[in-house]
Amino acid sequence: MKRSDVFLRPEYAPHRALWRASGLIDEELRRPLIGVANSWNEIVPGHVHLDKVAEAVKAGIRMAGGTPLEFGTIAVCDGIAMGHEGMRYSLPSREVIADTVEIMVEAHRLDAVVMVTNCDKITPGFLLAAARLEVPVILINGGPMMPGVYGKERIDFKDLMERMNVLIKEGRTEELRKLEESALPGPGSCAGLFTANTMNMLSEAMGLMLPGASTVPAVEARRLWYAKLTGMRIVKMVEEGLTPDKILTRKALENAIAVDMALGGSTNSVLHLEALAYELGIDLPLEVFDEISRKVPHIASISPSGRHFVVDLDRAGGIPAVLKELGEAGLIHKDALTVTGKTVWENVKDAAVLDREVIRPLDNPYSPFGGLAILKGSLAPNGAVVKASAVKRELWKFKGVARVFDREEDAVKAIRGGEIEPGTVIVIRYEGPRGGPGMREMLTATAAVMALGLGDKVALVTDGRFSGATRGPAIGHVSPEAAAGGPIALVQDGDEIVIDIEKRRLDLLVDEKELEERRARWKPKVKPLRRGILRRYAKMALSADKGGALEY
């Protein structure tokens, strides 16, 4: 018995009348009622085409004998929200998305749901919703954008962000306009391995997306093929009773981390996987990420770490090929269940790597270590995260003098104004989950650093986040955050800070007695917040090492 059968009982005549008022007939009510949670809107370039993806999903549901019922949820474009107050709303939107899907599915007793996703916080929000639901769930993404072409060069959002600063400074407005018109050629999630594509790939690695689906470009017909197959598969999952609790296990999370390390994904993936683990009630300390990072080599160098794009990874075999490589070396849990009803290994055992320059063999990796590293030390007792694959090896150890800012805007002004000297560690604090609130991304700051030729001369440390497009020695998610009284709140201009990625250390070279005196004088900065979601998030958000999730 499916749970929507409740509407077929005689005493549910008023409910059936309401369904009929929406246009449904008896035959449709007798079939599985399948929700299609669509994050389409006309704002986000990664989502403008999701209406077509959702239509293909619904076609697949009908072909398999189900009744599709589409509803919407919100989606924020992190790129459009970047570099201003709007970025405070991005991370809190993750929980709102999870809430909206949970409410719609549970309130209307739907039998299953397909989640149509693509960009940064939408996929993590859907994953949190899946963790809460007791009905079958599949995700289908809208696919990556193709890289832009500027002259003979392939480019992406990162290139525009970094080059913009120099072009503006030199007054080359026409060249900036041409670059702006070339960087993002059409629909899809930004072409590099930024947060959106990272989280879609990890959803596939965890088994919540059909094998091969996550990397198919937005503009290809295969995107609609996968959408139809997803719609067909969800109906079968209702018959099988295949629910997320059977798929979203510790093994699935560890498989996702292994793929993340092999690819060198966005540092935001750590935040979102920690939030998912919290939602699932699974203890996932940051040390697990570090343990896996030390075992899994970095075998795919995709922008911003390298010159390849997600479309190249797709052509090389996609996530099935990556999982096959890791599986043959015993670096994933082969027996983890997936939405196909089969194990990960059953899905990928026949996959092949089609381009060894894009996906290297494990014995010839880009780096013997995973793409992300967890740092701890006197400046980050509970941890911090760096995209090690995007840091030149000669910068893995960096000792510098602190220049402290209490908001991103002040740091950006100083960088663009030529106030930052080589050997500086730029510290941006009070940008954490509660202190921000909202834990903004610092891409504007890091892009300015790279553009002005400081990328190998300075480092940046923050209790905020970084965009997946960030490269260079940028250390984020410093925990505890400044607003919670973490050591980062006590840093002063002129203090020495040591970053050692190989030893996984982040240390403030100030003696304990001096820190105690500073702590005695420290007072938390309280930002006035009007009523609304930021005020609520500031009160309820956990620290970055817990994913910035809302505390239950």
From Swiss-Prot:
Active site: S467
EC number(s) stated in the UniProt entry for this protein: 4.2.1.9
MF GO annotations: 2 iron, 2 sulfur cluster binding; dihydroxy-acid dehydratase activity; magnesium ion binding
Any Pfam family matching the protein: ILV_EDD_C
Protein residues bound to [2Fe-2S] cluster: C119, C190
Cofactor note: Binds 1 [2Fe-2S] cluster per subunit. This cluster acts as a Lewis acid cofactor.
GO cellular component, one term: cytosol
Iron-sulfur listed as a keyword: yes
PROSITE patterns linked: ILVD_EDD_1, ILVD_EDD_2
Annotated residues for binding of Mg(2+): D78, D120, K121, E441
Residues carrying N6-carboxylysine: K121
Superkingdom of source: Archaea
Cofactor dependency: [2Fe-2S] cluster; Mg(2+)
Catalytic activity reported: (2R)-2,3-dihydroxy-3-methylbutanoate = 3-methyl-2-oxobutanoate + H2O; (2R,3R)-2,3-dihydroxy-3-methylpentanoate = (S)-3-methyl-2-oxopentanoate + H2O
InterPro entries to which the protein is assigned, alphabetical: Dihydro-acid_dehy_C (IPR042096), DihydroxyA_deHydtase (IPR004404), DiOHA_6PGluconate_deHydtase_CS (IPR020558), ILV_EDD_C (IPR056740), ILV_EDD_N (IPR000581), IlvD/EDD_N (IPR037237)
Pathway, per record: Amino-acid biosynthesis; L-isoleucine biosynthesis; L-isoleucine from 2-oxobutanoate: step 3/4; Amino-acid biosynthesis; L-valine biosynthesis; L-valine from pyruvate: step 3/4
GO biological process, one term: isoleucine biosynthetic process
Gene3D superfamilies per the UniProt record, alphabetical: IlvD/EDD C-terminal domain-like (3.50.30.80)
Family: Belongs to the IlvD/Edd family.
Function: Functions in the biosynthesis of branched-chain amino acids. Catalyzes the dehydration of (2R,3R)-2,3-dihydroxy-3-methylpentanoate (2,3-dihydroxy-3-methylvalerate) into 2-oxo-3-methylpentanoate (2-oxo-3-methylvalerate) and of (2R)-2,3-dihydroxy-3-methylbutanoate (2,3-dihydroxyisovalerate) into 2-oxo-3-methylbutanoate (2-oxoisovalerate), the penultimate precursor to L-isoleucine and L-valine, respectively.
Subunit structure comment from the entry: Homodimer.
Protein name: Dihydroxy-acid dehydratase
